[in-house]
Amino acid sequence: MVLEIVLITGMSGSGKSVALHALEDAGYYCVDNLPPQLLPAFVALEHHHHGNRVAIAMDVRSATSLHQVPQELHRLRSQGVAVQSIFLDATIDTLVRRFSETRRRHPLSHDDPQQERKALVQIIDLERELLADLREASHVIDTSQIRASQLQSYVKSLMPGAQGQLTLVFQSFAFKRGIPMDADYVFDVRMLANPYYEPALRELTGLDEPVADFLQLQPDVDLMRAHIEQFLAHWLELLDRNHRSYVTVAIGCTGGQHRSVYLVERLAQSFGNRWTALKRHRELDGRQ
């Protein structure tokens, strides 16, 4: 059987432990804070002792060796290992708030607590710089506006793509709450007719049939969908040929409730026949 390796990295406070626990629940043998220089020996050992599914978490405490990881992942892939690298991220405001709420110290913090509070933003900026190469080589998940249970479910949903097939993630969002940090492509659909201004549709979402019926009658909506599909169809083929594992396509409208949700549903349906297509509705998920 093909050996599956899932690497979990990312910013301190972004949810790496939550993601690792999700993989443990899914049947992966998990290890936390593995030094990067031990990765080759560990992979060889665990393949013989713990089966075919291994998840590894690394953080910035191994910063001096992390630059080796992308090259090592490439080597493992060339040997037929199915490797996924997931990088968890969040906005700086979110990370600062999480450290404040948990009262935990940042791994790169100074010994002086007073200095730590003053420098937390600078420490996070330094961490982001140290992890930049690893982030570039990974599938990025923005955890700023999702709960732990939602992150666990999302990480588990990514696992079927471990065999190297391109996985598309279509995500709806509200511009007023910020563009998702993990988006590879962002499409603005705020110029389309808004069901919010129809009293009978205001409290519904793009998942509801009356909203879908309304939007299907708008020529510009269908034209927007067709143009997005045409753009993606061309470039996804190239990304697939270059062995890209994940592409996140974010569709944004004003409230993330009607237009973007509807288009995400239609795009996922359209591209699901060719690739693995996942759906996320950021603002709707936050209601649950």
UniProtKB/Swiss-Prot annotation:
Keywords annotated in UniProt: ATP-binding, GTP-binding, Nucleotide-binding
Chain positions recorded as ATP binding sites: 10-17
Protein name: Nucleotide-binding protein Veis_1053
Keyword ATP-binding on entry: yes
GO molecular-function terms, A-Z: ATP binding; GTP binding
Stored NCBIfam families: PRK05416.1
Role description: Displays ATPase and GTPase activities.
UniProt keyword annotation of ATP-binding present: yes
Transmembrane spans: none
Residues reported in the UniProt entry to bind GTP: 59-62
Family: Belongs to the RapZ-like family.
